[in-house]
């Protein structure tokens, strides 16, 4: 099941629970062992008990003589790619000495924007009614394990991602709340340590490359402010946001999946989870607008353009960040759902068509501007080929390098279909650009010096020989 609103509360819960249930609990010796005889655990400053990758946190209340604890188990699971084999699944089983039911739910960790798209596409809409009717955290945990009736369950997993098994258990009042169940994830064998070292080295190499570019542009800016273009600044900002958010998300997800449940990992992961899409897309849009307007490339960059870019980026960042978080309180049925889906599709396809328009503008300006030193003029057909090749290579690199590091799988066919749709949008943008440019040049007064210079060059006149007086 996919939901992020309750998941955020669930992950934050162990670090903010302030109740102390040990005051009235019956003291037990510290060497209490579970069924397997394992006593490896530790207690953090918030009162949560860590058993390998499983966290047990005493809650602030009790039901009769039984104490309740929240249980969280998170792991990075790699789904099996071989369809002939048995698929990946999660197995949860109560221990033999369990006396009370255990309520639970399995959550797949993903960004709010991905969940938002799923709701608009008609996926997991049944969770909306559950969220609106939730009064307690226990109401969200719809499934249960009952001793001697249904003590175990197998939950299938179809995608590689970070999964969290959450629930509430009831135990007798003892000092150490041992887990009453065992949770095991079955999938492809986890990668060796070299895989995680590769992730760290890749992120380090990208960060060093970005730092070198940023430092170079900073020195150029200090030496000569006219030597740095707005396109370079916006590109550096976008790449910095991309590397920062994805690096923290990947590293935190790997750390959480390996059992390192520190506060820093959780806070950084939640920050990148919520604000990643908004920051990255707003920075990317600013870069595209700088290219489309030609700021600092073919015309001077005025202050009003920067104000406009900042306003557009701010509005888009708010929309992408907070609009997905509104699905728990909104109803996507009826007219409101149709209108929301229409707006979202227009935003998606028009937004992803902007890069083609930016490429077209760059090549047209490169062919017409003397400042860049290009004399050859690029035809529309050649520009289209370059744009289509660029988006294909970008999608392949994105699917082959970035997404595997994030632990998710996307369809290459879907990305290619999206590329074709955005390619058509690019042609429309290019046609509108040619029309607008023709109208602009038709009614724009032409300076005399520029007109005279172009006229002299078009006539190919040779200078007259000097006459002797």
Swiss-Prot record:
Topological type in the membrane:
Multi-pass membrane protein
What are the TM regions of this chain, as residue ranges? 199-219, 236-256, 283-303, 305-325, 338-358, 386-406, 413-433
- Alphabetically list the UniProt keywords: Membrane, Signal, Transmembrane, Transmembrane helix
Q: Where in the cell is it found?
A: Membrane
* Region forming the signal peptide: 1-19
Q: Does the keyword Kinase apply?
A: no
Cellular component terms per the entry's GO annotation: membrane
| Protein name per UniProt | Uncharacterized membrane protein C61.05
Q: State the species of origin.
A: Schizosaccharomyces pombe (strain 972 / ATCC 24843)
Which lineage do the record's taxonomy fields give for this organism? Eukaryota, Fungi, Dikarya, Ascomycota, Taphrinomycotina
